[in-house]
């Protein structure tokens, strides 16, 4: 056998290979096999590797987003940051530092996902603890990481279509490249199976071979060729599986000969992708217009339902005769599903609207129209299952429209009676008077509550709150119409309820016409809000049978009077109603209204110059340190266990809307200024009195905390201004005190919030002068022998008559020990009060006396316990001896005699100890009586000295 055949080829027969040993040629290590050599190897660049890593991570992020796996999204995002850091040199080199569009698009999608997940509080509650934690971490890291891509993100938000086109091109190129590779592999492998001919250099389509040897192999190629012929009919795989051609595919089919089908398909897909991305940016209210545009383009809109039906079921059969009974039965059938678990609330509203259209078309009368519209209102109320949450704005606008139309029907047809006292069996729809079961007042009360919820949900500092506040005009108009309707019915209880709703929208609003009418600037027949409130409240006082409505009406009436400076009317209402005694038994909403009334009453008293009354009104609110919570204007942060989640949720529901808030800084400033005007003269008058009481604990704490500071700078906050003014007043410097209270900063913060700010500022300066004068006299009365009244008037810029009246009042009240000399216009001091050294000596003597008494009581307690303990011990010994004697009665006489002698000796010792104790007690009693006698003599001498001084003063 020749050496040629000894080498062994792949085409040798089995017999030849078995008969001769095959001599294999040694192959170098790390060489590729024949099969691997046949496959074309691709060498990827660094750019392709980095971009492929990024695309894989982006795909994993999208997959994790679909299932809301926040932990995996966070992990993938961290991998993305590391991968992009590695790819950054390639981006700087290949893209000239421009961020790849696929990266920008992925970041934008992730930003939308993170924001939506964070804003959706309900879904966040359903997340696990790890996912919640991962979402917070992801949000922080993403917001920090996204700062470097702000410009790219803005460009993407402005034109997302450009980014979508490039991504589609990349995907199409990848698909095209993969298809070409598959074709190349088939071309290279298939001829090897078909024949042993030499392969051509260029890849060509495989044709079936007619040889008999290859007939078995050729069947596969035939099937492939036939399938490829069938596939050739379609431009793409997408067209193959389409149920019917669309507009886009028709355009592709009718493309000009110069443009290939693939290119036309690319353009069409890019166009639709850009439209889809742009639609994502549109608001929800434009979806209806988008659907209309899609219908024009050839899309078929399918409205899915729970039952899977594509069309809305018909209300009645085609040949059915529509009458009142049929419509009412259908209405009852629709409303029977109200409140059930699987009821589609949106579809229920649509059913009712369709039923309303049918009733209007067949002209079934006003009663049926009122019944259907009232049920539509109820269905809209039921659409929001959350009691505490506010309804959507689209439902709110529809609710306003439906109630307005319903009221028009009720006011236009006086023979239609809508009342909840009418039973379903006695409803009348055909003949007048029409009777329908329902309560318009309840619907309006629910509407008012929903309006309040909407205001609470909005940010008070945004334009949205202003827009929602504009809805108060239609709400108040609806209440006015219901007032007219209820007054026509004549039910007193319902009239009181709707009057109270009208009061709730009126009591906190300031009417400048009231003050103008008081000054004579308006005609006398002008009806102001005060007169309107007086009429409404008086009716409730007379007709209401429940305490709650009457109490709320009184509180609102007082609030409105105080708001318009009717101080005496407001004060008399408070005193006559005795609300302060029974308010603790009221519900929380009424207690909040009471707190608001007291705050506004305090402001009114301050504007009228009644400083003491203002302080008394505000002290209960400010002493607690929680005026914000007491007025329902927000929650103060508390410790973890002081307030549970349920309590916090309930308190948030009780909060007042922002436009009804009372300025807390204004309240605190008025309270502190009132406390300063009362506390500083009192402190000066009772400087050496150890038992003096504090008028205002809060003001006293502010003053003491300021005195403890080693370095005190110029005042900045409102509290610091008041404390600085108080320090100036203690020295009698009224000018500095007034400058601290009335200045540009304080005017902006506080005083300009009053209606007549200039009058309030003048009133405060007048009181500061008067109280500074009183403080000056209390502080320096022991220094002067006499003081000139004109000098005091000039010093404090007060008229002489005012200074004279102030000093006379102080002398009459025995606050100042002095006398007025009218001819010389001087104040003569009587020197009745002790000097500073004498006062300190008397304080020291009192404290030493109290200390001695306390020590004596402690000593007596200790000595008494000691002696009592010894006596008990002797008594116990007696009992023991007596018990021993009883036990030893049967013993011999000697032992009994010894025990008796021992007992006698013990009794003798106990008697001596008792005599000594009595002697000690008598001695201590004598000493205590002697000291008490000395103290009594000292007190009598001091009282005699004071009586002599008083007599001298009187003379």
UniProtKB/Swiss-Prot annotation:
<feature type="compositionally biased region" description="Acidic residues">
    <location>
        <begin position="162"/>
        <end position="183"/>
    </location>
</feature>
<dbReference type="InterPro" id="IPR000717">
    <property type="entry name" value="PCI_dom"/>
</dbReference>
<feature type="domain" description="PCI">
    <location>
        <begin position="658"/>
        <end position="834"/>
    </location>
</feature>
<dbReference type="GO" id="GO:0001732">
    <property type="term" value="P:formation of cytoplasmic translation initiation complex"/>
</dbReference>
<feature type="compositionally biased region" description="Basic and acidic residues">
    <location>
        <begin position="230"/>
        <end position="250"/>
    </location>
</feature>
<dbReference type="Pfam" id="PF01399">
    <property type="entry name" value="PCI"/>
</dbReference>
<dbReference type="GO" id="GO:0031369">
    <property type="term" value="F:translation initiation factor binding"/>
</dbReference>
<dbReference type="GO" id="GO:0005852">
    <property type="term" value="C:eukaryotic translation initiation factor 3 complex"/>
</dbReference>
<feature type="compositionally biased region" description="Acidic residues">
    <location>
        <begin position="219"/>
        <end position="229"/>
    </location>
</feature>
<keyword id="KW-0396">Initiation factor</keyword>
<dbReference type="GO" id="GO:0033290">
    <property type="term" value="C:eukaryotic 48S preinitiation complex"/>
</dbReference>
<comment type="similarity">
    <text>Belongs to the eIF-3 subunit C family.</text>
</comment>
<comment type="subunit">
    <text>Component of the eukaryotic translation initiation factor 3 (eIF-3) complex.</text>
</comment>
<feature type="region of interest" description="Disordered">
    <location>
        <begin position="157"/>
        <end position="299"/>
    </location>
</feature>
<dbReference type="GO" id="GO:0003743">
    <property type="term" value="F:translation initiation factor activity"/>
</dbReference>
<feature type="compositionally biased region" description="Acidic residues">
    <location>
        <begin position="288"/>
        <end position="297"/>
    </location>
</feature>
<dbReference type="InterPro" id="IPR027516">
    <property type="entry name" value="EIF3C"/>
</dbReference>
<comment type="function">
    <text>Component of the eukaryotic translation initiation factor 3 (eIF-3) complex, which is involved in protein synthesis of a specialized repertoire of mRNAs and, together with other initiation factors, stimulates binding of mRNA and methionyl-tRNAi to the 40S ribosome. The eIF-3 complex specifically targets and initiates translation of a subset of mRNAs involved in cell proliferation.</text>
</comment>
<dbReference type="Pfam" id="PF05470">
    <property type="entry name" value="eIF-3c_N"/>
</dbReference>
<protein>
    <recommendedName>
        <fullName>Eukaryotic translation initiation factor 3 subunit C</fullName>
    </recommendedName>
</protein>
<keyword id="KW-0648">Protein biosynthesis</keyword>
<dbReference type="GO" id="GO:0006413">
    <property type="term" value="P:translational initiation"/>
</dbReference>
<feature type="region of interest" description="Disordered">
    <location>
        <begin position="865"/>
        <end position="955"/>
    </location>
</feature>
<dbReference type="InterPro" id="IPR008905">
    <property type="entry name" value="EIF3C_N_dom"/>
</dbReference>
<keyword id="KW-0963">Cytoplasm</keyword>
<feature type="region of interest" description="Disordered">
    <location>
        <begin position="1"/>
        <end position="22"/>
    </location>
</feature>
<dbReference type="GO" id="GO:0016282">
    <property type="term" value="C:eukaryotic 43S preinitiation complex"/>
</dbReference>
<feature type="compositionally biased region" description="Basic and acidic residues">
    <location>
        <begin position="911"/>
        <end position="955"/>
    </location>
</feature>
<feature type="compositionally biased region" description="Low complexity">
    <location>
        <begin position="206"/>
        <end position="218"/>
    </location>
</feature>
<dbReference type="InterPro" id="IPR036390">
    <property type="entry name" value="WH_DNA-bd_sf"/>
</dbReference>
<dbReference type="GO" id="GO:0003723">
    <property type="term" value="F:RNA binding"/>
</dbReference>
<feature type="compositionally biased region" description="Low complexity">
    <location>
        <begin position="882"/>
        <end position="894"/>
    </location>
</feature>
